[in-house]
Amino acid sequence: MTVVCDEGRIEWVGSAGLAPRADHELEVDGFLMPGAADRHVHIGLADPGAVLLGGVTAVRDLAWPPDVIFPLADASELPTFNGPLIRAAGPMITAPGGYPTAERWAPPGTGLEVRGAEEAATAVEVLAGRGAAAIKVSLNAEAGPTPTDGELAAIVQAAGERGLPVTAHVQGVGQAERALGAGVSEFAHCPWSERLSESVLEAAAKAVRIVSTLDIWSFGNVTSELRTATDNMARFRAAGGTVVYGTDLGNGAIPPGIDVREVLLLRETVGMTADEILEALVAGPLESGGPADLIAPARDPREDLTALGDLKLVIRAGRVVTAA
């Protein structure tokens, strides 16, 4: 396969014999594919350069102080930026004293406390004006108070009016049901704190997608949280639900770049095929007009998923980051 890139975009994809002339050529002995996208990171707790070298060319940050993360997201658009493209939610909307305001990992401003439906809607308006790519809401009843049903409804409505998805951190009995009832778009983690009923998972499969984040509960070990999350995810998928790749990078011992442990958990404990995992992993199809964000594992990952940890090439916005 030959891919021709120009000014950060893919210009042409096809066989070598039909390719248009290019100013520079690079031959790579590997499997050429789109770069990976991690839909749940805290990039302020990670090294963006290492994330990119590991094959993740786009990330979505799901909770960080707005005065830090939005300028960083803007900077990631520049050709000189050493890291992945960053899209950001900004701070997580929460109740006064709610998660993550007391967490050690979260600097001041990571949680945005709201009081009442009007304040909740205004928070969404402000974040949208600053360039938020999504709105994250905290429904962690195990760590503290959560937004009221009225506040949650106002958040979802205000986000919908601005074309923004709402992703929910659901933790604690009944929080998944609350999120679904309010009309959120996504669960930022697969629920791990309780085994969800078949009826809840069937409703979820029709309404939300789930960001995987399995390795954050295990780091290579088998835990009760991992067993609950994978059981919920397998049944969610059996009901027709969509899973996308995400790691919660920055929290715990998650490696920068593509987390092969996460990928293997999706296959071994959830039952996803290699093709399904790659579809969940990549930022988008390899096609003309798309971003020139490419990686080349040493082997075909459809046959050996561990090849995603052995990269021969990383290209970000048409710029060669590394080539072996």
Regions found by a protein language model. Name each.
Residues 3, 8, 29, 37-40, ...:
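Divalent metal-coordination and catalytic microenvironments
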Residues 48-140, 144-164, 207-217:
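Divalent-metal coordination cores built from histidine and acidic residues
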Residues 1-21, 299-304, 319-320:
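N-terminal metal-binding scaffold of metallo-dependent hydrolase/deaminase domains
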Residues 228-301:
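His/Asp/Glu-enriched, well-ordered alpha-helical/loop segment
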Residues 138-231, 239, 244-251, 270-272:
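Active-site core of metal-dependent hydrolases
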Residues 93, 117, 167-173, 298:
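Glycine-rich beta-to-alpha transition loops that act as phosphate-gripper elements at the mouths
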